[in-house]
Amino acid sequence: MRQRGFTVLEMMLVVLLMGSAASLVIMSFPAMQQDTAERQLQRFQAQLEFAMDSGMQNDRLLGIQIRPNGWQFQVLQSQAAETRSSVAHSDRWQGYVWQIWQPRQAALGGQVPDNQPLTLRLPPPQEWPPTAEPAADPDILLLPGGEITPFTLIFGEKDDRSEVWLRVDESGAIATSAKGGAP
């Protein structure tokens, strides 16, 4: 009587060979690229476009909190009734609070190196960084209809003379320093 299939030893050998081949492939990858300002701009732009599309498709109000050391995407969520009175400025959003937005299968937000601080420019009379605003509110709003708070985000390198920036108008059109122009 002949047996069909593979033995456990044969299967273990195949797994070992596949693991060895995978480790050789991974070792042949080039070293990680440096986190240049251009790379940070591309990462932010891709995340912004994803957030704008997702907000329109899912009818959600999203926001972006910008800090000199990075950015974070937020979503406006309903807050439980018993915790509304304990949160400062909770009446501002009428029972809703800003929470970190982490959609499935997407890692949003980012940190920048210390030598590449972010600078956000908002149209007058808005100012950044906010002085009287609570820290939990986003600096930029992405509305479900496709509108967005107009802004210019500068990815600075202290030792670099060229300025790397991204500008977005109220309709969501994006312009970058890679395409030329001035911020």
UniProtKB/Swiss-Prot annotation:
Source taxon at top rank: Bacteria
Coiled coil: none
Positions annotated as propeptide: 1-5
Any Gene Ontology biological process: protein secretion by the type II secretion system
Gene3D superfamilies per record: minor pseudopilin epsh domain (3.55.40.10)
Transmembrane region(s): 6-26
Job of this protein: Component of the type II secretion system required for the energy-dependent secretion of extracellular factors such as proteases and toxins from the periplasm. Part of the pseudopilus tip complex that is critical for the recognition and binding of secretion substrates.
Name recorded for this polypeptide: Type II secretion system protein H
Organism: Klebsiella michiganensis (strain ATCC 8724 / DSM 4798 / JCM 20051 / NBRC 3318 / NRRL B-199 / KCTC 1686 / BUCSAV 143 / CCM 1901)
Source species taxonomy: Bacteria, Pseudomonadati, Pseudomonadota, Gammaproteobacteria, Enterobacterales
